């Protein structure tokens, strides 16, 4: 299994747009956008000169299967947030989350030299919460009725892991290093 992260380029925008509008992908996202190529291009260009975000396409054996990002990169306070989705749902359940989780932790703490990695997850997305907890992230709080979507309010948990914690536990996990462009 060869997994790699390649920088998003303009040729990826139509595929990202397709993934981003799938109900099974947006179910646990804050928005359900009706995207166009015009809005995709605008988003893409907004990321190009923005040092506080990084976006990659997730490739599995050369096939583009999803998107991963680091955002809110704060070098002063040494923290950032992250998120990802597997847009091609036929690739879910293959251990990809393990590789992404461990390698992003290494990238954030070793390459970017940050101290904390955060994320926000719908409380109903128990599978993802469990994955984050498995690799050392802890729930730091709950944002009550934080997202209004499809006529309902949803609670969100905030999660985080620090550099020290990851350094202390990473030896317990066996994972291959992946190429991050």
What are these regions (language model features)?
Residues 35-38, 47-49, 86-87, 175-176:
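Juxtamembrane/interface motifs at transmembrane-helix termini
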Residues 27-29, 56, 169:
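Short, hydrophobic secondary-structure boundary micro-motifs
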Residues 45-57, 66:
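A short helix-loop-beta-strand connector motif used in the catalytic cores of GNAT acetyltransferases and
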Residues 23-24, 51, 112, 136:
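Structural motif
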Residues 24-42:
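Conserved GNAT-fold acetyl-CoA-binding loop/helix
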Residues 2-15, 61-181:
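Acyl-donor (CoA/ACP) binding surface of acyl/acetyltransferases
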Residues 20:
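Residues forming the ATP-binding cleft of Hanks-type serine/threonine protein kinase domains
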Residues 16-17, 25, 40, 82:
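Hydrophobic pocket/interface hotspot
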């Amino acid at each position: 299994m060869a997994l790699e992260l390649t920088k998003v380029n303009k040729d990826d925008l139509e595929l990202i747009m397709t993934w981003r509008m799938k109900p099974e992908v947006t179910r646990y996202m804050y928005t359900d956008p009706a995207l166009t190529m015009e809005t995709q291009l605008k988003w893409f260009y907004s990321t190009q000169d923005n040092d506080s975000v990084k976006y990659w396409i997730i490739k599995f054996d050369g096939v583009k299967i999803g998107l991963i990002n680091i955002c809110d990169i704060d070098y002063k306070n040494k923290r950032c947030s992250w998120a990802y989705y597997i847009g091609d749902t036929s690739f879910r359940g293959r251990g990809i989350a393990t590789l992404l989780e461990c390698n992003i932790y290494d990238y954030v703490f070793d390459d970017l030299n940050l101290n904390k990695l955060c994320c926000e997850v719908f409380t109903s997305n128990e599978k993802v919460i469990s994955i984050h907890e498995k690799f050392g992230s802890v729930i730091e709080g709950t944002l009550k009725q934080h997202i209004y979507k499809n006529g309902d309010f949803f609670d969100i948990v905030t999660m985080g892991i620090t550099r020290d914690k990851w350094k202390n536990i990473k030896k317990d996990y066996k994972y291959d290093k992946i190429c991050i462009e």
